[in-house]
Amino acid sequence: MARYTGPLCKLCRREGMKLYLKGERCYTDKCAFDRRPYAPGQHGQRRTKLTQYGIQLRAKQTVKRIYGILERQFERYVEKAMQKAGDTRENLIQILEARLDNVVYRMGFAINRRQARQLVNHGHFLVNGKKVNIPSYLLRPNDVVEVREKSRDLEVIKKAIEANKERSIVPWIEVDYDNYRGTFLRYPSLEEVTDLPVDLQTVIEFYSR
């Protein structure tokens, strides 16, 4: 499947906000967005007023880039969220947060979602004791995610744990770093996902046109 492989900092600059795609680096003075907080390109510093369509498009692009999802798959998620009963925004965030690569990141076994996706692709994680190498695999409540025994000495995983072990874990996830495992306790509510910088209603409206 095609995947964006260009500079991650350009994505933050294009959306006009930090998306924290590089993990620890985004919190340091090396962050490119802090140094150049405007869109990339020759005319990046020009301010343009967005139309309603433009606002919806930027919101949709921001969510896709945060979770590292391509258009076709993201559109399927939105359709699925619309078909389910209840609040479409909450349905959508629960789908996004249940992705295995996202949960690996939330548990602190990777410094960002991109790294989590690579680690899952390379087969370093078990779900309920079975190897799963599909980043988009959707977890269910009480599913247990575990670093494979032979992968526990990987420097990249050790560094991620060291960087994240003092940080608070989101309430819908439980982590046991000593045993390299965590549990996806439940789906989060919309209000609990506080690090998403856009209004999902704007995203839903884009696909409802």
Curated annotation (Swiss-Prot):
Ranges annotated as C4-type zinc finger: 9-31
UniProtKB keywords: Metal-binding, Ribonucleoprotein, Ribosomal protein, RNA-binding, rRNA-binding, Zinc, Zinc-finger
Subunit structure: Part of the 30S ribosomal subunit. Contacts protein S5. The interaction surface between S4 and S5 is involved in control of translational fidelity.
Entry coiled-coil feature ranges: none
Cofactor(s) recorded in Swiss-Prot or TrEMBL: Zn(2+)
Family annotation (Gene3D superfamilies): Ribosomal Protein S4 Delta 41, Chain A, domain 1 (1.10.1050.10), RNA-binding S4 domain (3.10.290.10)
Protein name: Small ribosomal subunit protein uS4
Function: One of the primary rRNA binding proteins, it binds directly to 16S rRNA where it nucleates assembly of the body of the 30S subunit. With S5 and S12 plays an important role in translational accuracy.
Entry GO CC: small ribosomal subunit
InterPro entries noted in UniProt: Ribosomal_uS4, Ribosomal_uS4_bac-type, Ribosomal_uS4_N, S4_RNA-bd, S4_RNA-bd_sf
Family: Belongs to the universal ribosomal protein uS4 family.
Cofactor binding mode and count: Binds 1 zinc ion per subunit.
Highest taxon of the lineage: Bacteria
Binding site for Zn(2+): 9, 12, 26, 31
S4 RNA-binding domain: residues covered: 98-161
GO molecular function: rRNA binding; structural constituent of ribosome; zinc ion binding
GO biological process, one term: translation
